[in-house]
Amino acid sequence: MAPKAPLKNLLLGQFVMARKVGIDLGTTNTVVFIPKKGIVINEPSVVAISVLDNKIISVGNLAKEMIGRTPDSIITSKPLVDGAIADYRVTEAMLKYFIKKAGGFLSFVKPEVLISVPAGITSTEKRAVIE
């Protein structure tokens, strides 16, 4: 019987493989790709926000389901409109949510992220995505 690899090495190996993330930040959908896993997320670029405390309530499919069905205290927003970033804060929150949802990342090590953005993005918007 072959000796088993220590659990630490197995976990570290899985983590190293999942350190890179590709994101297609589109006006309609956001797609997240992880090498050797493929597309792990393909959800609408929609965010639901609480007007009362200005907090993000849901992102993606759940937020899309809320369009037209929310009370006055909740708004749904598409942070990208006509190939441009309409709301930087909401776009940032959406990106963080999708990266976290893609999973497999330790909180103290940031993944390498490649983000594809709409062609009509301005230099200011490009800088905001990079930050």
Segments predicted by a language model, with ranges:
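Nucleotide/phosphate-binding catalytic cleft detector across ATP-hydrolyzing
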Residues: 2-131
